[in-house]
Every structure is written in C-alpha cells, then in structure tokens.
Amino acid sequence: VTHPFLDLPPLTADHFAAIERRVAGLLATEQDVVIPQGEALLPLEGCIRGGARPGSTALNVVTGPYGQTFGNWLRDCGAEVVDLVVPFHAAVTAEQVGQALAAHPEIDFVSLVHAEAATGNTNPVAEIGEVVRAHGALFMLDAVASVGAEPLLPDAWGVDLCVIGAQKAMGGPAGVSAVSVSARAWERLADNPR
C-alpha cells in the first residue's frame, strides 16, 4: 500500500485567487499578482527573461550577490547591460541611478534588490522609483528579503515587477513566492519574442 507524501487536495483556481488577493493586500497593490509554483528564484529569473531581450538595454544595480546574478541572466538574454556597482557595505542612491540613466538614455529595464540578505543593506526604492519612472524604464524589484521586514509599496514606488518570497523575514516555507505585475510589464512580457 502506498500513501501520498502530502495528502492535501490540490488548490483550486478559487483558492489561488483568494491567496493572490491577500498577497495584493500585503503589497498594497492594484496590479495583478501571480503565484508561481516554485521558490523566488523562479519568478526573479522569469521577470528578467521576460523583460529583457536582444536589443534592450538594462541598468543592473549591483549591491550584493543577487545583483551579480541578475547581470548574468540579463546578459544571457542578449540584453546590453550597464552595471551600477556599489560597495557591498553601502546602499545605492537615487542620484547614482539617475546619473546612470542620464549617461545611458537607451536603458529600458532596471533591476534592483530592495534588501540584500547577504549584506544587510536596504536600498531606497521609493526615491529610486521616482527616477526610474521619470526615465520611463520598466522597473523590476527583488523584495524577497524585504517583504515583512521593510515597508514595501510597489504601486506607490512605480515598481512594475515586484518579486517576493516567504522564506526570509516572513518566516514561511521555502518554495513559496509571488510577483506583482503592472499593465506595462504585461505588455513588455507579451511583446518578448522568446
């Protein structure tokens, strides 16, 4: 006789919709929320691979190891990548992001880690979001380590793709993640030929 490892019934579409509404409330977002079946690296990579492509130029803010990983994914997508690297013991400033955008007006995608778990630094997303919004680039935020520990307002901050995970400050299980997706982001994802 065999027994299922987990004898829980599968979640229905209604259950997922209810969870997505609760996550939207947590993020104070009116955007769509998608819950992938996987840990946060899955939607992080998916957002980058959907938002970047050959012919696009990305500003990749590197304040720790996750920013380095994002740069590798962006290059793998064929995007031209401008790395804005700051010392791992410091946060990036909106002024630095603005200078990078001004120096490279072709930038159409920005990736940023809100809070680097490996370094303990938190980047000023509200101020950076203003600069990115004024430039017009799509803005992706890794909020895996910050959700539940820091204020997180993707709509107010102009974040188009906001990825969260349950396993860090929220104390939840690994393998649970979500992403809020703006209308601009959906258009960009739909337009990606890959």
Which stretches of residues belong to each language-model region?
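A glycine-/small-polar-enriched, mobile loop at the entrance of the PLP active site in fold-type I
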Residues: V1-Q37, L41
